[in-house]
């Protein structure tokens, strides 16, 4: 079973307030987002997280689309640093796909000007 968690207390400060998907059957944790020390989608054994306290995050899984139609939502979870590194080292990110005006595109296929524009429009200093 997969459980979503937010780590609220940990010996490793990089884990504080990070979000993970725990797979109890495999004994693995997949990083959704962390301040540092762990990459997005990195899978680690649960015991590598050390002594932690967490709160469960409700997850809704719908096995099928309703009869009246479905909704589609694409959410990109990225850090500014990831896109900036992709600009400098595109060979490290051949599969990096982002949403631009409702379309999915490979970040590396954009011109440098478009890449800068995406970074500027996507990330703000505050809400």
Swiss-Prot record:
Sites of Glycine radical modification: 102
Cellular component annotations (GO), alphabetically ordered: cytosol
UniProt domain Glycine radical: residue ranges: 5-127
Pfam families documented for this protein: Gly_radical (PF01228)
Keyword annotations of the record: Organic radical
GO molecular function: formate C-acetyltransferase activity
Coiled coil: none
Gene3D superfamilies attached to this UniProt entry: 3.20.70.20
SUPFAM superfamilies hit by this protein: PFL-like glycyl radical enzymes
PANTHER family (UniProt xref): FORMATE ACETYLTRANSFERASE, FORMATE ACETYLTRANSFERASE 1
Function in brief: Acts as a radical domain for damaged PFL and possibly other radical proteins.
HAMAP family for the chain: GrcA (MF_00806)
Protein name (record): Autonomous glycyl radical cofactor
Native source organism of the sequence: Enterobacter sp. (strain 638)
């Amino acid at each position: 079973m997969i459980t979503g968690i937010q780590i609220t207390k940990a010996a490793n400060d990089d884990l504080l307030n990070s979000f993970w998907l725990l797979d109890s059957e495999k004994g693995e944790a997949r990083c959704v987002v962390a301040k540092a020390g762990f990459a997005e989608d990195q899978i680690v054994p649960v015991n590598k997280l050390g002594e932690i306290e967490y709160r469960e995050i409700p997850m809704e899984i719908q096995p099928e689309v309703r009869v009246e139609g479905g909704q589609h939502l694409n959410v990109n979870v990225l850090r500014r640093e990831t896109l900036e590194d992709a600009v400098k080292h595109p060979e490290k990110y051949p599969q990096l796909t982002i949403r631009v005006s409702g379309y999915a595109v490979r970040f590396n296929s954009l011109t440098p000007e478009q890449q800068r524009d995406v970074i500027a429009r996507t990330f703000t200093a505050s809400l």
